[in-house]
């Protein structure tokens, strides 16, 4: 059964293999924070000035919040509209002349004789009327005149049941009228209108209408529905509704509101003082133009006024009152970049004073360490940049302390301890306090490491001066992306005098007119070979190019004329004015101290130090505003020699003695350089010249005196190697620059596709 399936499975297996061979590795997915997207294109890549960063921190200090209103408290268009009319008097057809007539006679003349309407007069309606209309009046005007004279006599005309009922004013509502939302022009006698309000409350509208309305004209208010009910004749209702339209406006949009934080003193007390001067009870022209409310939780004063420009004047008064306050308060400032303890020390240097507590030492960011680059003090490199050696005093970076260590622990970043572990420095107390002298006053400043916050107890005036200094110091430091290529070049042929000599002297002008070919390379002496210089090597026909921003071209050019071996190609980010250490090699134990107490056979004690060997590069960049990068560089290539033969014995006393220490062949350069952003500098001249003697020949015969040379020969090989260092610093001013570098490396990884073996 299996033999029959085998031919069928073979094509399937072959197809799967072909598909797997054609598959490619998907490109890496780089995820980013969308908040890092540039908002203004290329402007996002520019360096932020100290002034701009200070403005960005302005939100940290309490600033007034002002909303300026329109200043419009009434409906201007409604107030300017003309009053409604009933038509011209010339359109009328009747004239009246009443001299002390009774109300009943006037009602009969207008309603009965002129308009022909049914009417009923209640017994309680009494009064006399004097009325004359030399010009003819219309029926609508006559009805309006009747409503007016009835109102003067405390009577109302209510249309109900197809007739007009003339009743006393206090009986006009009960059981005779119902609320309506119709237009006042449709009113026939005394009616009631329900008016919904948009912005103003019903109770406030009642206060506004009371001076203009007849007694009992405001029937009622409903706060839950925010409506007001009005009663009156057509003319009265038109006036009432027009008044409502004038005052029912967006009051909040017209009012100006300001919230002013108080630095010294209490908001409640300051608000009460302002109320006495500008409030409703004050005897000033601006009385009632302001409303002051203390906000105790925020220690601020809320100011409301219908005039926007008044807020500026109130702010000036508040600033004067706040500045004049001599009270001492506790201020806090949460720092973003610099350590609180270090900033407290800087403030002590600026304003003068003294401090106590915590550990001193400058640092640009929380957790950062500032050290010094230096040479050895005892011939060995001991890196104390991160951590310290037990029992030893800390030395400079690139230097060695003279102390000893039983454990052999080193604090080198990227290195290892004697037990093979990288150790962080112990957590130290970074809290501290200083006392400043600001404008003759003592100011207490406390640094809280847990929240990286400064606590300052002082007056508001002194706090302003201290805060200005804090905002200038608490800025984001720039970073530098350093690409280095460390190579070892074999000095043979044209390179026998060194790499630098080769570029300066062995490169001459080409013979061809077009600048290509010729027996020699184009001259680079005096031209700055790190600019755009190109030519060709005629010995093997390989072209080469030097570019100021392309260190790989230099490596490629040297690789064509000699043997070249890359020792290290690190790429690292480092903060401005901080140190980057790269170490690839071995740690060699060195017996520094041996003590024999003489108290028995096993009474010898030794102290061992571990020395870093291999390729060690230490760089500290310092960036200027114009894009120049100053570099402090220490480069070392060290190789341990062979251990003495006597140390291979089993004797413990011999192996552990200082005589068993190996020699370390070291090539080191320490320099300071200045380079433009993105350009490459080369360090050369670390030449190692070694000679190896050897002999071979016929055994025994080649060792005979005098004639032994006839049966053998002696050899002597000279080996010259030079270490060159190419360093390219690139300034990273903001997160967008860091993203661009990530994209560049990501594109390089994407281009590394698997090889297609089927082609």
Curated annotation (Swiss-Prot):
GO cellular component terms, alphabetically, are: cell outer membrane; type II protein secretion system complex
Where is the segment annotated N3? Answer: 326-474
Quote the residue positions with lipidation, kind S-diacylglycerol cysteine: 22
Region S domain: which residues?
A: 736-759
The answer to keyword Nucleotide-binding applying to this record is no
Using the UniProt annotation, give all residue ranges assigned to the region (N2).
254-323
The role this protein plays is: Involved in a type II secretion system (T2SS, formerly general secretion pathway, GSP) for the export of proteins. This subunit forms the outer membrane channel.
State the protein's name: Secretin XpsD
